[in-house]
């Protein structure tokens, strides 16, 4: 899980979602997981 100021999709499998007022990226590749904070 990477915590970044700006999250973005890295590949076509990445999906932007909102959980508990935070923007997150979930993907089939665990390296692409990101959280905004």
UniProtKB/Swiss-Prot annotation:
One Gene Ontology biological process: translation
Domain of life: Eukaryota
GO CC annotation: chloroplast; ribonucleoprotein complex; ribosome
Key words of the record: Chloroplast, Plastid, Ribonucleoprotein, Ribosomal protein
Location in or out of the cell: Plastid, Chloroplast
Keyword Ubl conjugation: no
The UniProt record lists the keyword NAD: no
A GO molecular function held by the record: structural constituent of ribosome
PANTHER family: 50S RIBOSOMAL PROTEIN L36, CHLOROPLASTIC, LARGE RIBOSOMAL SUBUNIT PROTEIN BL36C
Family membership noted in the UniProt record: Belongs to the bacterial ribosomal protein bL36 family.
Name of the protein: Large ribosomal subunit protein bL36c
Lineage: Eukaryota, Viridiplantae, Streptophyta, Embryophyta, Anthocerotophyta
């Amino acid at each position: 899980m990477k915590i970044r100021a700006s999250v973005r999709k890295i590949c076509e499998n990445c999906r932007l979602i909102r959980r508990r007022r935070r923007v997150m990226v979930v993907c089939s590749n665990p390296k692409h997981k990101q959280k905004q904070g």
